[in-house]
Amino acid sequence: MKLEKISKPIFRHAGGSSDNIRIRTLTDAATPSIMGINVKEFPEVHSVSYRFLSKTYHGVGVINQNNGIEFVGQDLTDSPMTLNSSGVTFLPMEKEHRSDKLCIFADMMDYLAYQTLQKNGFVRVPSDCDFMIMSDVRNFIHISVEGDDYDMVYLYFPNDVMGCTITKTLKDRYGKHAIECNPLYKGYNNLLQFVKAIEITTNSK
């Protein structure tokens, strides 16, 4: 299997110093809402700001397993970015208990899109799941092995060549335990675009 590299920036601040990045617990004064969901409901999501070339960027992020940060801006207009080290992000449903279901996403934006569907009930999505965010194609082997431990694995990858290749490869690996979720957002590049289209339609009524 040959996968094209995801075109995603990895920002490493000068000299390895963390002075340019600030991580805070979400508060009322911090970023409270993205796509209509209160991100403070998710303890794994933090308020993140970083400074680069005299400009400060604000948004939210989660910490991956290599202590890097998967960052998205408040308005979701830019691509997600990894600050420091790339790595898989594992978000268990419960800290001390592994679910028998796993949802795998290409990036954090699709994870937030899923949470929007879960909250607003636009369409039915699986619940009571653990979550894994791949973030970079170099993490593919890691996520494929992790999925072996679950009874059901829901695959939320983009409807592009790379996403379809990953979906098919994981489907072949997990067999009947894998559910391809990209038909849900057929006609859209990814889950985020699908959710944004639903919100536009809903708000225009």
Where in this protein do the model-derived segments appear?
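Phosphate-handling DNA/RNA-contact segment within nucleic-acid enzymes
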Residues: 51-146
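Terminal peptide-recognition signature
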Residues: 32, 114, 155
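Surface-exposed charge patches
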Residues: 30, 112, 172
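Basic, glycine-enriched DNA-binding surface that flanks or lies within the catalytic cores of DNA
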Residues: 2-88
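TOPRIM fold recognition
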Residues: 118-205
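Conserved hydrophobic helix-helix packing surfaces used for dimerization/oligomerization
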Residues: 23, 101-103, 153
